[in-house]
Amino acid sequence: MTVLVTGANGFVGGAVVACLARDSTTRVRAAVRRSSVTAAMTGDVVPVDELDMNTDWRQAVQGCHTVVHAAARVHMMQDGGRDSLTLYRAVNVGGTLALARQAAAAGARRFVFLSSIKVNGESTSARRPFRADDAPAPVDPYGVSKAEAEDGLRTLGLLLGLEVVIIRPVLVYGPGVKANFDAMLRWVQRGVPLPFALVRNCRSLVALDNLVDLVRCVITHPAAQGQTFLVSDGDDVSTAELLRRCARAMDTKARLLPVPLALLRTGARLLGRGAAAQRLLGDLQVDISPTRERLGWTPVVTMPDALRQTAMALRARRRP
């Protein structure tokens, strides 16, 4: 069975390629942007141009049974406004649907789409976690574009006989993670005092290994067809507890200061960082019980173990 993985040189896509390559019954084809191709890349690597509605995927999808679509215009904190939504739609909607059409035309049977929990919204309340069957409530351009891509894929699936499977991950962390999570780890490692001792929120995260294992599962699982799955570690934590766990993973102690939440929110608002504060102070939980029950799937790594692996990778990157 040949599986095409897009975004194969990215954080998630690269891990999916590595996982599937360990299965002797699966031939992995890695699609990467033409500008990212290097001489060090080996195996079945297919270069593609910029992702949009005009991308030519014919070489990449030829002979593929399944497509795992991990390539996307990713969420950036500073993105916003109408022009931003246009850019997100071009890649995440137009590019995704063009790939699905060409894959179906080439005879692909299944299309696994890496979406985002942002389709559900930005936060939960009253300890009521998001569910896959909740009405979509995206807030930012990235979430809107992912929701529209999901709708388009469901329609194409019905029209073209393509088995569409959608996965909505929460924040993904693991060895090689970048951006805010990487910055947080470095703050903890350096002993930077952080004002989150009083934060008692509840947030779901997913280790890279757990997300990748779910992708592996839905590629062939008969009960995955036409379904949407939420995924997390099944171990929700507060920001304060997450920082403590990160510190333990790095054999240090988190320096947390007891700053009142109202003061944190006010300060963030005055600095124009309200959205960032919500991610640190607010709740975002997901219910993965339907994922577990329908697929017989369970997370393969615990959060403490995944954080230790992430910390080890961070230390390895810092060595000369």
Regions found by a protein language model. Give the residues of each.
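Substrate-positioning beta->alpha
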Residues: 177-183, 197-220, 226-230
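Catalytic helix-loop patch of NAD(P)-dependent Rossmann-fold dehydrogenases
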Residues: 82-90, 124-172, 193-194
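Mid/C-terminal beta-alpha module of Rossmann-like enzyme folds, strongest
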Residues: 217-275, 304, 308-311, 317-320
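N-terminal Rossmann NAD(P)H-binding glycine-rich loop of SDR-like oxidoreductase domains
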Residues: 3-23
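Conserved Rossmann-fold NAD(P)-dependent oxidoreductase catalytic core, especially the SDR/UDP-sugar
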Residues: 97-141
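Conserved C-terminal active-site "lid" loop/helix of NAD(P)H-dependent oxidoreductases
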Residues: 208, 241, 267-298, 309
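NAD(P)H-binding glycine-rich loop region in Rossmannoid oxidoreductase-like domains
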Residues: 36, 48-94, 98, 102, ...
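Glycine-rich Rossmann NAD(P)(H)-binding loop
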Residues: 174, 196-202, 229-236, 245-251, ...
